Amino acid sequence: MTKFIFVTGGVVSGLGKGITSASLGMLMKARGFRTTNIKIDPYLNYDAGTMNPYQHGEVFVLDDGGEVDLDLGNYERFLDTSLSFDHNITTGKVYSAVIEKERKGEYLGATVQVIPHITNEIKERIRRIARDYDVVIVEIGGTVGDIEGMPFLEAARQMQLEEGRENVAFVHVTYVPKLKVVGEQKTKPTQHSVKELRSLGIQPDAIVARSEEPLEESARRKISLFTNVPEEAVISAYDVEDTYEVPLMLEKEGLARYLVRRLGLPEREPDLEKWREMVEKYKSLDKEVEIAIVGKYVKLADSYLSIKEALKHSSVANDVKVKIRWIEAEDVERKGVKLLEGVDGIIVPGGFGARGSEGKMMAIRYARENDIPFLGICFGFQLTVVEFARNVLGLKGAHSTEIDPQTPYPVVDLMPEQRDLDRLGGTMRLGAYPVHIKPNTLAKRLYGREIVYERHRHRWEVNPDYIEKLESAGLVFSGIAGDDERRMEILELPDHSYFIATQFHPEFKSRPMNPAPVFRGLVRAARERKYGG
């Protein structure tokens, strides 16, 4: 019988429900249970694909092409797994499905309502995923009390009734502030949040109390008393330096152990040895390199969350910490490349649109001409081609037709299948595609394989008409699409210490114990630049 754990949030948003859910999933998997995570996003968008990163953080891309919430990236990294588009349930998806069924006459003339039709659709989607698992952790986005989240909380309540209390548990993540004026942790916001949850028919089984410092015993007792949750199930989740410490903290607090007993699962000791070694190694690193990320969404670091994590994974693999220098691409246009002085490596990440593109190309040229380890990703790959065409081939005015449709040298152009589309959502080249890697190249040394599968999210590509000219000037296209040999996937400069760019997003498949090869190589090159081989 599948066990369900619903994770809800209260008091304020941004508490770390995603990390809590991912950590709990990892602890269950470490006990040998077949575990997966589902994220519910109550917004009306069908998916995250058309959202501004400043509003919602990065758009994470799955193997099947799903454009989803960044929390699914945390789930994949913590559980070392690959999820599907169905693992992200949105209000947009649910309502679209219900309206489609109504139009087909599947409700037999009934008045279609939130209860039971919307709630039934939600439950059906959760159960569809659950068939192959022992434990399913469902994170409900937003905060208890939000209008958008009400149908999902109601569906969760109904699931406990239908599946049986012994098969469904609730974990509520709250915030316990400490006021400087009185110097004590205040539990009243948590009490009110649980009161709101109970008014919806849900009694939490465990409370994860987020705070700056470890939860005081007096606060733990008070939360237990006023929320009707056992003291052992009031979990202290205080701020830590590294999110990968959270599973170890929650294990020490006994959250998974308590839920295993609560759900009648066999009690097992988790295998956390490798995870603990990884965390301890990261904390003990004494060398440091600085890598610049030159982007257009750098004011919100979550816009590039997977890149941050891939650098962290690679830092452990290379015995050196990575300090990130966040640089707004438009600032490079205004202030020049002096903003890049002293860095040990440069990344130009993905993005869309003209804003900051010239600044990104200034950074690419600086890396190329000064032999600074460089990695370009997606749009960064395309702009690397543009920069090379302009400054090495001498094609003045060369550009991508995305930015300059009238460019005399369209070295980057819209893919043929992307023309004449009447909608933006879900229409890019999305998901995992095969990439064929050429022998005797940097890419082959990094990957060690001839064929790799990497995740994509793009509409533009290197114009096949210019490939021969670019290669004759020294640019090496070392990776080619498996589905179209005229589509370039990886480029590199062989006479450079480390200069590589990819049309795909390698960060989406990077894992704590298995860093993405191009990131691992970048950090290694940065370390060698600073400390020698």
UniProtKB/Swiss-Prot annotation:
ATP binds at residues 14-19, 71. The keyword 4Fe-4S does not apply. PANTHER family: CTP SYNTHASE, CTP SYNTHASE-RELATED. It comes from the Archaea. This is CTP synthase. UTP binds at residues 13, 186-191, 222. Its EC number is 6.3.4.2. InterPro entries: Class_I_gatase-like, CTP_synthase, CTP_synthase_N, GATASE, GATase1_CTP_Synthase, P-loop_NTPase. One of its GO terms (molecular function) is ATP binding. Pathway: Pyrimidine metabolism; CTP biosynthesis via de novo pathway; CTP from UDP: step 2/2. Residues 1-265 are annotated as: Amidoligase domain.
